[in-house]
Curated annotation (Swiss-Prot):
The gene is acmA. It catalyses: acetone + NADPH + O2 + H(+) = methyl acetate + NADP(+) + H2O. This is Acetone monooxygenase (methyl acetate-forming). InterPro entries: FAD-binding_Monooxygenases (IPR050775), FAD/NAD-bd_sf (IPR036188), Flavin_mOase-like (IPR020946). One of its GO terms (molecular function) is NADP binding.
């Protein structure tokens, strides 16, 4: 057993963790990043299932603090796949010489704050300890998979795998009867990718999804030169748009004629991206009539691609509004269900009750015999990555207990009662969901780095949100969230996919630009809402 003494310990080596490590090292801190994976990449290390890829355009899903780093990598597609994304993050780690300060295959199991010394003690799964002044969590929004959901999973005689724990060696689907549980963004990517490779595919659907077609052209030298020439423009604009994408809301619904609205929807739909969702009309999140009109537009597009009226009933949503769930991009996903070897099984009213040795059993007693079960069942979003670590703050309080009652943060950057623990990709910030993740994670990691710089420059050693500061942010967050139609819908956006999880809109819905302004204003006002000592 060993003890390592640091100024700062970073948990995670994905987009946020790599950048945080780089920035704190540039300050001259003794800092190290830890990851239970055997490679860097975070989300893009773990999620190597068939079809995994960006749905942010590749050229905006990049770091914008270093022009040479940005231009030193050339993407092959508008929306590249997992293997290329993982290679890019390894390129970043190598270009910034980060590996010498990274410990892989090192799982942090506990973190305890010592009030007498104002330092954190982290313990690894191997029993080693890390003593650090600052604990920075870069664990990812979607990194705690919902795996053990059904009785009998261990009894299954075939292969059962969660998409976020996909084996590196892959799975041979030839001649196999395969079941996919879940049809969210991940499930859709898997389903459309493996349908032609399996003998039989059954998709177990609880909630139909609005899905938009992806247009994913390859990038040659001209396209690469085009996006690289836009580095300065993207650096200036992305932090200020509503979702951190290059497109933004521009027109109010009421200012356009019905014909103009339709034309705008058609143009955004034809863009082949998330533009229809994140840049057509902001009113889809607040006005039920606008939400219904845009939802019907998407339903119309989906109906036109589905031959069978029964498939329309199974696959097209009717009881919630477009955009209030995570909107997936797809490539011929709907057409997959026209294949003779693919069956959609609706389990909303006839749910899965258990996994048997030979397959999946439903409430009515039906057993679907399978050789492979793929669980595209999502994550304990925002909170699970931290509550699965035994994190203890002041007075022995635990984060798991605190968040089991009420999910609260201060700007998604800290939690009252946990001094010097700074967080990324946790609730009550845009990085919880409604954001191009690199835009939001860069904002948060830069704020954290600057806060630590400020403490050191002023001779302070501790930063902690005040109870009043946290309450003010929670109230502001909830006021915006309660006016948003996302709050009226059941999805992981409000934590309803996790039994017993307190309901709260996880993502800050005031916009990326507004969030950035709020965090910078707090810092400029002497870290208003935080106590420094």
């Amino acid at each position: 057993m060993s003890t390592t003494t640091l100024d700062a310990a970073v948990i995670g080596t994905g987009v946020a963790g790599l950048y945080e490590l780089h920035m704190l090292r540039e300050q001259g801190l003794e800092v190290r990043a830890y990851d239970k994976a055997s490679g860097v990449g975070g989300t893009w290390y773990w999620n190597r299932y068939p079809g995994a890829r960006f749905d942010s355009e590749a050229y905006i899903y990049q770091y914008l603090f270093d022009e040479d780093l940005y231009k030193g990598w050339s993407w092959s597609q508008r929306f590249p796949g997992q293997e290329e994304i993982e290679r890019w993050l390894n390129y970043v780690a190598d270009s910034l010489d980060l590996r010498r300060d990274i410990s892989l295959e090192t799982e942090i199991t506990s973190a305890v704050f010592d009030e007498d010394r104002n330092r954190w003690t982290l313990t690894t799964a191997d029993g080693d300890t890390i003593d650090a002044q600052f604990l920075i969590t870069c664990c990812g929004m979607l990194s705690a998979p919902m795996k053990d959901l059904f009785p009998g999973q261990s009894d299954f005689g075939g292969q059962l795998v969660h998409t976020a724990r996909w084996p590196k060696e892959g799975i041979d689907f030839a001649g196999k009867r395969v079941g996919v549980i879940g049809n969210g963004a991940t499930g859709i990517q898997v389903i459309q990718s493996i349908a032609a490779d399996v003998d039989e595919l059954k998709v177990f659907i609880r909630t139909p999804q609005y899905a938009l077609p992806m247009k994913n052209p390859s990038y040659g030298p001209d396209e690469v030169a085009w996006y690289k020439s836009r580095f300065g423009e993207l650096k200036d604009t992305l932090p200020h748009t509503f979702t951190g994408f290059e497109y933004d809301f521009t027109d109010a619904w009421e200012d356009l004629t019905p014909e103009q609205r339709r034309a705008r929807l058609e143009d955004d739909y034809e863009n082949g991206s998330l533009k229809l969702w994140l840049a057509s009309f902001a009113e889809i999140f607040s006005d039920e009539q606008v939400s219904e009109e845009v939802s019907e537009f998407v339903r119309e597009k989906m109906r036109a691609r589905l031959v069978d009226p029964e498939l329309c009933d199974l696959l097209i949503p009717s009881d919630y509004g477009f955009g209030t769930h995570r909107v997936p991009l797809e490539t011929n996903y709907l057409e997959v269900y026209h294949r003779d070897n693919v069956t959609a099984v609706l389990v909303r009213d006839n749910p899965i009750t258990r996994i048997r040795e030979n397959g999946i059993e439903l409430a009515d007693g039906t057993v679907h015999e399978l050789d492979v079960i793929i669980m595209a069942t999502g994550f304990d979003a925002g909170t699970g990555a931290l509550t699965r670590i035994d994190i203890r703050g002041r007075d022995g309080r635990t984060l798991a207990d605190d968040w089991s009652r009420d999910i609260r943060t201060t700007m998604g950057l800290m939690v009252h009662g946990y001094p010097n623990m700074l967080t990324t990709a946790v609730p009550l910030a845009p990085s919880a969901a409604l954001c191009n993740m690199t835009t939001c994670l860069q904002q948060q990691t830069e704020w954290i780095s600057e806060a630590i710089r400020h403490l050191r420059a002023t001779g302070k050693t501790v930063i902690e949100p005040t109870a009043e500061g946290e309450e003010a942010w929670v109230a502001h967050h909830d006021e915006l969230a309660d006016a948003n139609l996302i709050s009226k819908t059941n999805s992981w956006y409000v934590g309803s996919n996790v039994p017993g999880k307190p309901r709260r809109v996880l993502s800050y819905v005031g916009g990326v630009g507004a969030y950035r302004d709020a965090t910078l204003e707090a810092a400029a006002a002497g870290y208003k809402g935080f106590a420094l000592s």
